[in-house]
């Protein structure tokens, strides 16, 4: 309001000026000022953004580990940041409050998935569960997943499979103990996780599925490709560069491997007569084929749809499980006093028994705290699977355009000093008598996501991880290969993929525990 008197005073002074040519100039400047105000008032109020470069936008700020780069940028630009990666508008959320607003208040608007070169090729036009567009098809396939494939009852039905495969793992480690040599624990954990998952999904172990053992390489190949930078996604006119980088040929080759692999699995299941089997003994492929055959679904489940869903179970279940186990064992090596306390708990609960059962796991409270703390520091997917806004909205006081890609920086939220005391330290006790859990309701701790797009395989994965971890701690002591090495010196560098697995394999010396 104070501007108006000043303007009136200036206007009266003009009449005293004899040099009248100044008047048109004043009107011109006034017009330009008003035009600028009108134009600026029509601009959307976008979130803060780091300076971008012509054409590439903010791509140069991604770094080799985007979750770490985004965390550093959020300290300057705040918990809601806006980027342009090529032509693609992108939102990055780095606080629990904003994650809550996104996944609760505006969950539907944020529930879509962007189409990308890798997901479209690998997942049969994004007709799986994780990357399919939000809508009726996604609701139906998620319903199948939750009720038929990953229900608590179904997960419990695979307990025998978990026990048998873990027993094989323990026997392998026990045999290696006699040699007193270092073992590649990462390799053994990957093999074990893969065997458990493929038996549940396909009814066979990894090497038995294709007869060559090549399938064991596929999960991490897929995870790396899903996180790879394809020029086509950000600069459609530069898609040819993907041929030069090698990503496009690698994508084509991997898609061919996957398709042949899945076709073989599905055809084998179709020719096998398993109708007489008990429902709880059937694997995921059996269940999906039965649903397809009986016409019990509200939509047509095509051959490609079926393969896409199986691929989700196969790749997602295998890689996230082994990655989680690698990180928790690495943290225990770095924190020997915590490992000792965990071993004492596990061995006390198991007692003189020769085998750990599921009821024992339920009594291992400290082990569960250790797993939570490891998931806090090392979420399997540090930068959430991207979402996409289905329409424009107000979010955190900002204007967010439709078709904006959205990432939640889970890694940054779970290391936020405003939420966690000594956030960079491994302190399992922080979860003792603490109701905070990883089911997606506490947004300071969302290693498996939250809202409609939260991970449906959480129960399955946790059951495997807890059982494997309890066995590794019960029957063995562990140390680094070098006698003089300190746990704190263990390299903890991660690799950029959809799942952030260790850059270097975890090699340890197992020592058979004598009770």
Regions picked out by a protein language model, each given a short descriptive name:
Residues 59-78, 257-260, 357-397, 417, ...:
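Conserved cytochrome P450 K-helix E-x-x-R motif and the immediately C-terminal K′/meander segment
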Residues 336, 458-499:
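Cytochrome P450 heme-binding "Cys pocket" and the immediately downstream C-terminal segment
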Residues 311, 434-465, 493-496:
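Cytochrome P450 heme-thiolate "Cys pocket" and heme-binding signature region
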Residues 43-59, 68-161, 165, 185, ...:
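Cytochrome P450 substrate-recognition site 1
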Residues 2-42, 195, 463:
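Terminal signal-anchor or tail-anchor transmembrane helices
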Residues 392, 408-436:
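Conserved cytochrome P450 K-helix/beta-meander segment immediately N-terminal to the heme-binding cysteine loop
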Residues 1-15, 26, 290, 498-515:
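C-terminal helix/juxtamembrane-tail motif
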Residues 114-122, 156-325, 341, 358-359, ...:
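Cytochrome P450 heme-thiolate monooxygenase catalytic core
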């Amino acid at each position: 309001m104070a501007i108006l008197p000043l303007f009136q005073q200036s206007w009266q002074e003009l009449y005293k000026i004899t040099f009248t040519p100044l008047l048109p100039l004043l009107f011109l400047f006034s017009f330009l000022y008003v035009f600028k105000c009108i134009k600026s008032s029509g601009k959307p109020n976008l979130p803060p953004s780091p300076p971008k470069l012509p054409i590439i936008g903010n791509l140069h700020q991604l770094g080799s580990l985007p979750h770490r780069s985004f965390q550093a940028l959020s300290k300057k630009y705040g918990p809601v940041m806006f980027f342009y990666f090529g032509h693609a508008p992108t939102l990055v959320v780095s606080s629990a409050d904003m994650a809550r607003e996104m996944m609760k208040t505006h969950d539907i608007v944020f529930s879509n998935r962007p189409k990308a070169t890798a997901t479209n090729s690998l997942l049969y036009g994004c007709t799986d569960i994780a990357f399919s567009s939000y809508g009726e098809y996604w609701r139906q396939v998620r319903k199948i997943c939750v009720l038929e494939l990953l229900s608590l009852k179904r997960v419990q039905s695979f307990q025998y499979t978990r026990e048998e495969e873990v027993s094989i793992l323990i026997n392998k480690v026990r045999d290696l103990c006699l040699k007193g040599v270092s073992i590649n624990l990462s390799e053994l954990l990957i093999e074990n996780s893969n065997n458990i998952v493929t038996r549940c999904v396909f009814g066979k172990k990894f090497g038995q599925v294709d007869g060559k053992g090549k399938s064991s390489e596929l999960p991490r190949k897929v995870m790396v490709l899903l996180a790879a930078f394809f020029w086509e996604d950000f600069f459609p006119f530069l898609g040819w560069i993907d041929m030069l980088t090698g990503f496009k040929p690698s994508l084509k080759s991997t898609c061919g491997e996957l398709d042949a692999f899945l076709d073989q699995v599905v055809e084998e299941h179709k020719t096998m007569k398993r109708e007489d089997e008990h429902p709880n003994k059937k694997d995921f492929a059996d269940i999906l084929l039965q649903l397809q055959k009986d016409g019990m679904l509200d939509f047509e489940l095509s051959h490609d749809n079926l393969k896409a869903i199986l691929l989700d179970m196969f790749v997602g279940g295998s890689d996230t499980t082994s990655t989680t186990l690698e990180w928790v064992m690495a943290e225990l090596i770095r924190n020997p006093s915590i490992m000792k306390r965990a071993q004492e708990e596990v061995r006390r609960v198991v007692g003189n028994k020769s085998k750990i059962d599921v009821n024992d796991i339920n009594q291992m409270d400290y082990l569960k705290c250790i797993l939570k703390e490891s998931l806090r520091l090392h979420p399997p997917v540090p930068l959430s699977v991207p979402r996409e806004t289905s329409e424009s909205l107000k979010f955190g006081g900002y204007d967010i355009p439709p078709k904006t890609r959205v990432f939640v920086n889970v890694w940054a939220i779970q290391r936020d000093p405003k939420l966690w005391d000594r956030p960079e330290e491994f302190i399992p006790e922080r979860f003792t008598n603490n109701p905070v859990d990883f089911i997606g309701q506490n947004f300071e701790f969302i290693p498996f996501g939250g809202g409609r797009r939260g991970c449906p395989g959480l129960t399955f994965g946790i059951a495997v991880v807890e059982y494997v971890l309890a066995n590794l701690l019960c029957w063995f002591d562990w140390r680094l290969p070098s006698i003089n090495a300190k746990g704190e010196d263990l390299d903890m560098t991660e690799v950029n993929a959809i799942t952030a697995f260790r850059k270097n394999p975890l090699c340890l010396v197992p020592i058979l525990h004598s009770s």
